[in-house]
Amino acid sequence: MPYKLNISTRKEALIKLMNVIIKRENEIIQALYEDFKKPKFEAIATETSYTISELKDTIKNIERWAKIKNVTPSILNFPSTDYIVKEPYGKVLIIAPWNYPFQLAMCPLIAAV
């Protein structure tokens, strides 16, 4: 049985995630420095800003991406109305390195929502 969340619930979850990342950006940057000696500018450019940008793009486009798409029916299926319905598969396992980029774990999470 597919796991279904409506689009507004998904957007809400993504907005909450974005707000947490924005609120705790300095803590994330500090952790990246302490663990990997990643400079602040590099952490902002490649980790937090990239992830926030990905979140904004997903929030902006999720309704369009999830919309039912009408497609031209095949002559083999005549008479029919064909369309593509994008539905979630269910639970997702995200495998990411524990010792490197924050965004390598976050971007698949964003896409999974």
Stretch-by-stretch model annotation:
Residues 1-83:
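N-terminal Rossmann-like NAD(P)+-binding subdomain of aldehyde/semialdehyde dehydrogenases
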Residues 74-113:
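Conserved small-residue-rich beta-alpha loop and adjacent elements
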